[in-house]
Amino acid sequence: MFVFTKNLFTTKFSSSLLNWRFLRTMADSLVDINERITSQGNLVRSLKSQGASKEDIDKEVAKLLQLKNLKLGGSEVSGKKKDTSFTLKTPKGTKDWCDKDVVLREHIFSTVTEIFKRHGGVTLDTPVFELKEILSGKYGEDSKLIYDLKDQGGELCSLRYDLTVPFARWLAMNPKVTSIKRFHIAKVYRRDQPAMTKGRMREFYQCDFDIAGNYDPMIPDSEALKVLVEALDALEVGNYTIKLNHRKILDGIFTVCGVPDDKIRTISSAVDKLDKLPWEDVRREMVVEKGLKEEVADKIKEYVLLKGDRSLLDKLEADSLLSSNSSAVAAFNDMRLLFDYLEAFGVLDRFSFDMSLARGLDYYTGIIYEAVTEASAPKIKSSAEKKKSADPEADRSNDDSIGVGSIAAGGRYDNLVGMFAAKKNAKIPCVGISLGLERIFSILRSKIPDEDIRANDVDVFVMAFGGGKEWTGFLKERMSVCKDLWANGIKAEFLYKVKPKPRQQFDAADKFDVPFAVILGQDEFAKGSVRIKQMGLKENSDEGQLVPREEMVSVLKKLLKYD
């Protein structure tokens, strides 16, 4: 007996010691991994701040992700999984939509959809992910923001970055479609620095309207911009300006200033930052990071800081250098037509001819534009200001240098379809607009009082009042009344209790600001009548209107203005 107990004790002690050593090793390993994650994260941030190449940054980011996966998965050496706890939350740059936010979002959807259809738009839906090669090489420096999906032994795929490239891919796959007005409202994904309260997210909706086909110059472009103006006016985003430019004017400027052909796109991306950074910072990026000669950068400055109305076009045409560039001259002709057509549509006063607008996406070939509001424009940082944290995972909602950004943008892309088409000459010219739902939402949500948004569309709450031993609660009667209201297109609810108290029913109706109540009084209902009461008034100020049961629907429709 003693030997058995001793062996049992020895066995338990040895096992406990081994477990303690294992846990100690695991703890030490976890500390080591945390230190390595911190060190690797600092290295990635350092490379980004130094303007290192994308290949070098991606290589170190991959190492950082491996370390994070190792931490979550536990020790690979032991082959055992670590029991980890985590904070229940949505991923950075995403959110759950509920309650009044959903109501406002649906209002934006329905508003722009009605306008898109008014102009002849038809719906197109494409997969949320595309083959990786479809998206590669279409977004310039922003390609680093594409989410690549992990290879599962099949096709290499990426989450869509926008709705434009998938549309062009669809056109290339359907050669019989040579013209179309298409709209698409769907989610896109970008690994950007999030600022949640300002609508800068990693998963967000775009509302796109595009016109594809061979038409006379600038006619579809002007209608696309007319659609944009109608949408922003209908949404009541406040005072806004749509900045206009032409890709060929920019190309002409870069050429006459002496920018090498292989640097034109990267210098264009630098110029596009002038809405957020002072010229000194943009110039430094051009010269120090991108190797442009200082005198070339100074020449560019003379052009890209220009902005104004259509009279700016006369000034540019009078420039001897630009007027000798065929690309710029062709763009001048386009702009003159566009200004005339926008004037015909009655929207010319909404536009600013802004030479700093470049749009970083590689697929634009002609007119480009971007809509900003007073609420969406970021504060331009002075070069003396200290830089904020470069952590790409940080939410930058409280960074006053980050605005909502452009609330809509777009342009002409004549060559994108041809990149995918089997025939080399299969080109379908396209022009389109894209509204950023979350950015518009953040502006509207800050302007509209909470009490002005109803989270529920119910117009009538069916109640029952009574008492005494014979009182049943009128559950089946309330169900029957709701059935009649639903059958006549009236949105109605009742409380899921057999014998609800009056206060419970009023509270349920008040929770969603239901405008009317249909009250089944114990005695009145027995006589074939119901009481229709307007809600939201002072207590006891209105007893309601007693109407025959058979007239209930017609009376409610008049009160609700359904007819």
From Swiss-Prot:
The keyword Aminoacyl-tRNA synthetase applies. InterPro entries: aa-tRNA-synth_II, aa-tRNA-synth_II/BPL/LPL, Anticodon-bd, Anticodon-bd_dom_sf, His-tRNA-ligase, HisRS-like_core, HisRS_anticodon, uS15_NS1_RNA-bd_sf. Residues 29-85 form the WHEP-TRS domain. It is found in: Mitochondrion; Cytoplasm. Its EC number is 6.1.1.21. SUPFAM superfamilies: Class II aaRS ABD-related, Class II aaRS and biotin synthetases, S15/NS1 RNA-binding domain. The modification Phosphothreonine is found at T90. Pfam families: HGTP_anticodon (PF03129), tRNA-synt_His (PF13393), WHEP-TRS (PF00458). PROSITE patterns: AA_TRNA_LIGASE_II (PS50862), WHEP_TRS_1 (PS00762), WHEP_TRS_2 (PS51185). CDD domains: HisRS-like_core, HisRS_anticodon, WHEPGMRS_RNA. GO terms for cellular component: cytosol; mitochondrial matrix; mitochondrion. GO terms for molecular function: ATP binding; histidine-tRNA ligase activity; RNA binding. NCBIfam families: hisS. Catalyzes the aminoacylation of histidyl-tRNA in both the cytoplasm and the mitochondrion. This is Histidine--tRNA ligase, mitochondrial. It comes from Schizosaccharomyces pombe (strain 972 / ATCC 24843) (Fission yeast). The gene is hts1.
